[in-house]
């Protein structure tokens, strides 16, 4: 309905997650009518990010440096390694400020049906870190989904084979949550994994 | 929290309307983890759009051509001119398929407090179209806000001075709407502007 170039921009904006045709139209017109500088800036930063952002050599998170901020910080605890699925998970745990070790980002989870095997989640890199002998505890923080649990199981077997202690983050009722509003699956898990006090 | 370039990308994405810090983070990671081609494409189309999209010489809507699709269509009704605030309004009216004349896009509305006067809404261009003598009816479809009404009043005075018939689109209860859920302002307007049947 718009001119070809504007239609093309609307279509390109739909690559963004959670953006449907109406939002994409609103975004395109907003940028062109009122924020051309912002549009120009977004275009340049996007191109730069696509060109320069790659995976951290050590933990596989996304970064434009050879080593990410966390891996290049020598003052963290070398004995603990936390394994997560995505870079956003690293930020979530960092924000909670309870973990001072290093991370390893799988950038996915084992899912044979989607063709994601040990190689795709960087198991070779992870195995060589296990073999270095510096790590004393591996904390597995993959999501509590079927694939996440399978991934956790697979990694824990590999770590235990190297004599490393393995733990899984706790799942149950969120702090401040009310039982009444918690889903059945979580509640069942919380009861079966109850701990003596 | 992320590496500088990723943080910069997240900030740039916040220029998009309706995108807060969480959505911007999700968008940035989605593009970098899973859709680099889409990101590259968006960057290129954005740069091209910022460079080439300007205002249609005749109706002031956004287009990369000298004249937009509608203005360059000689088979429309030259006697009717519909005045709207934004390019999105043109598309909305075109979709309803009840109007076959030409448009004029103000790209805003009179708002002295924001420094938007007759010049900013292209009143000089519009006045010269009124003066051409081809237009028989001007349909004013600015939004029913205080500024939109003031703009409608101002334009109608200018058009009437040239002997052109002026009309305003109808405001009232939306078709298919239920009185119970219509706001008081709309209901008051609908009652005071009731029409004999």
Curated annotation (Swiss-Prot), chains A, B:
The protein's name: Recombination protein RecR
Organism: Saccharophagus degradans (strain 2-40 / ATCC 43961 / DSM 17024)
PANTHER family according to UniProt: RECOMBINATION PROTEIN RECR
Function summary: May play a role in DNA repair. It seems to be involved in an RecBC-independent recombinational process of DNA repair. It may act with RecF and RecO.
Keywords recorded for this protein, A-Z: DNA damage, DNA recombination, DNA repair, Metal-binding, Zinc, Zinc-finger
InterPro entries registered for this protein in UniProt: DNA_Rcmb_RecR, Rcmb_RecR, Rcmb_RecR_Znf, TOPRIM_dom, TOPRIM_RecR
Pfam family, one: RecR_ZnF
Single biological process term from Gene Ontology: DNA repair
C4-type Zn finger ranges: 56-71
Record-annotated Toprim domain positions: 79-174
GO molecular function terms attached to this record: DNA binding; zinc ion binding
Gene: recR
Family: Belongs to the RecR family.
Domain of life: Bacteria
